[in-house]
From Swiss-Prot:
Its main location: plastid. This is Light-independent protochlorophyllide reductase subunit B. It catalyses: chlorophyllide a + oxidized 2[4Fe-4S]-[ferredoxin] + 2 ADP + 2 phosphate = protochlorophyllide a + reduced 2[4Fe-4S]-[ferredoxin] + 2 ATP + 2 H2O. Signal peptide: none annotated. GO terms for biological process: light-independent chlorophyll biosynthetic process; photosynthesis. Gene3D superfamilies: Nitrogenase molybdenum iron protein domain. Keywords: 4Fe-4S, ATP-binding, Chlorophyll biosynthesis, Chloroplast, Iron, Iron-sulfur, Metal-binding, Nucleotide-binding, Oxidoreductase, Photosynthesis, Plastid. It is an enzyme of class 1 (oxidoreductase). It holds the Pfam family Oxidored_nitro.
Length: 103
């Protein structure tokens, strides 16, 4: 959650954290699904992509390389949808640089 918040991304729904069946109706509002642990949620993310065209990111943000790649995948999905909805694109490279420059 903290990584997404640091990037300024509003979290639509965390499944199954404190969720109710009624909350599932909010799933289509997401621009992408984030699956930080492939063992939990990957099959659902694949299904949602296949059935509804909802992209997903399934890179676990652990370590410098994987965290940077995860952020770049998130950026890619946001920018693809931002172009369609005529919103501004994002550039998270400065954030990645800031987080890794002293390592």
């Amino acid at each position: 959650k903290r990584l997404l918040q640091n990037l300024g991304i509003e979290i639509n729904q965390v499944i199954p954290e404190g969720g109710f069946i009624e909350d599932l109706q909010n799933l289509p509002k997401a621009w992408f699904n984030f699956v930080p642990y492939r063992e939990i949620g990957l099959m659902t993310a694949v299904y949602l992509e296949k059935e509804f065209g909802m992209p997903y990111v399934s890179i676990t943000p652990m370590g410098i390389v994987d965290t940077a790649e995860c952020i770049r995948q998130i950026q890619k999905h946001i920018n693809e949808l931002a172009v369609v909805s005529l919103e501004e694109t994002v550039d998270y490279e400065p954030y990645i640089y800031q987080q890794t420059k002293f390592v």
